[in-house]
Amino acid sequence: MFVIDLEFSGLDPERHSIISLGVVDFFQPSRTLYLECRLRPGSAFDEEAFLVHGLSKEYLEKQSLSEQQLVLQFLAWVSQSPSKVWMGQSPWKDVEFLSRACDRYSFDWPFGHRFIDLHSVAVGHYYASGKNPPLKNGHTDLGLDRIAEYCGIPPRSASEHHNALTDAKLTADCFSRLLLGKGIEFSSSKME
């Protein structure tokens, strides 16, 4: 099983590009991969996305990998894993972008159609612990930072940009605390 996070130049996989990918092997957490790439030629870049990940268009233009090379390196990394089970925090957009990229470059999709979602695991943990998850406008209010806080992981700085590998590691640590009752090498806080 592996925990993955991606950053994009926007939210539409047809118009926007994958720009970074971070992945952690859940059972061998020292085995990681972090890649950044140039914008796909002709793809759009939304300034709102920059505010999330902090990777400027100018910075991305200097990257040596293309989106196609990034996806190919990721698929090679995954091919070394015995399990192709994908884990992530609300991974649907990540799945959508990678699936579209595999189609675009005629790469085989080696994954199943089921994914383990941290949000769902956290909601289940709240209820199993006799607690109600926090709500906002009638919906669960459990982003990655809120789940990390629930797991006893110190909060990130409010000004800290998202980084695909940092977020994949944080997600892996949350999964480990919720499913196995213990953190992994990425932090020393104990779940309460």
What are these regions (language model features)?
Residues 1-99, 147-156:
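Conserved non-catalytic scaffold segment of RNase H-like nuclease domains
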Residues 8-10, 120, 170:
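Short, glycine/acidic-enriched loop or turn micro-motifs at the edges of active sites
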Residues 11-13, 123, 173:
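Conserved protein kinase catalytic core
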Residues 56, 108-110, 154, 185:
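Short coil/loop linkers at secondary-structure junctions
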Residues 85-91, 96-97, 101-102, 133-192:
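Acidic, Mg2+-coordinating catalytic module of metal-dependent nucleases/exonucleases
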Residues 103-113:
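A short alpha->loop->secondary-structure connector
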Residues 115-137:
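Short alpha-helix plus adjacent loop in nuclease-associated cores
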